[in-house]
Amino acid sequence: RVLRALQFAARFALTMDEPSKALCRTIALDDLPAERIWGEFEKLLFAAQPSIGLALGLELGVIEALFPELFALVGCPQEPEWHPEGDVWVHTLQVVDQARRRLTGLPRPKQIAIMMGAVAHDLGKPATTAFIDGRIRSIDHEEQGVTPASRFLDRLNLNSIDGYDVRAQVLGITAQHLKPGMWFKAKDKEGVGDGAFRRLAQKVDLELLALVASADCHGRVPGVFDCTAMDWFRERAHALGVQHHPPSPILLGRHLIALGVKPGPTMGELLKAVYEQQLDGTVADLDGALAAARHLIASAQA
C-alpha cells in the first residue's frame, strides 16, 4: 500500500498529510516480492511527473529500504557550474521527468528502457565522485554505474519484456550516456567516424541512448545548457541506418563455404575480420566482402 501511495501521488499529483506519512513509515517493506515492487514502480514511472512519487518515496523511507543504489544518490554532490540544480538525486528526478516526455510513439518495452535508463544513468557517481583540482568530478561514472545498475535491476527482477532485452538496454544506456555529448564536442577536432557509430550500435539502441542523453542534458536548470548534441547524434545514427541495431553482416558462412572454407574456427575468424571492415566502411557490398575474404585467405596461406 505504501508503494501504491507513491504511484498514486505521482499519477494524480497528490500530497500526503503528516499522519498518513507517519503511518506509512511504520509499515515493513522487506517481505514484498520483486514482481509486486516492480508493478507499482512501473506505474510510478509512467505518471506525468514521476519525480513526485520518487520524492515522496525518499521522504517515507521507501527509497532507503528498497533501493539503496538510489538512496546513495542523495547528498552526492555535483559541480555547480554543470549541475546548479543540486545533488545527484535532485538531478535524477529532473531527468526522469524529462525522460517521461520523450516516450511518444515507442513500444512499451522501449519506453521502460528509457525510463529505467533515466533512473539508473548516474548510479556510478557515488563511488566515483571526488574533489579534484578545485572541481567536483565523477570520472568514469558511466562505466562504473553498470554494477550498481545491475543490482538495482536485480531488485526488480527486470530482464526482458515481450522478448525485448530491457536489462541490456538499461545497462548500455548507463555505460554510454555521455557518448552523444562527448562525440559532439570531438566532431570538429579529431572527428568521430561512421565506424564508431556502427560499433556503439552493437552495445545499445542509439535512438534510446540519444533520448536519455537529451533528458539528462535538459534535467538541469531550464534554458541554460545547449543540448543540440543529442539532435546531431540522432541524425548521424539515422543517416547510417544504425539507430536501433548495428548493420547485419554482409558476409555469411555460406559465402565462405563457396570459397572452399570449411566450418570451424578459421571461418569464424574470417567472418569477424570482414565484419570489422564492414563496420569501418571499407566493405560495403557482397563483392567487396568476398574480395576482402579472398585477400585474408591468401595472406594466411602465404
Model-derived regions, located:
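Glycine- and charge-enriched loop/helix tracts that form the active or gating conduit
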Residues: 1-115, 119, 123-140, 144-162, ...
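Alpha-helix initiation/capping motif
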Residues: 17, 33, 166, 193, ...
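Histidine/acidic-rich helix-loop-helix segments that form or flank divalent-metal centers
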Residues: 76-84, 158-227, 242
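Short amphipathic alpha-helical segments and their helix-coil junctions
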Residues: 93-100, 191-197, 250-257
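Active-site lining segments that contact anionic ligands and/or coordinate catalytic metals
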Residues: 111-115, 120, 169-171, 205-212, ...
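Terminal helices and disordered tails flanking the catalytic cores of nucleotide-processing hydrolases
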Residues: 184-190, 217-302
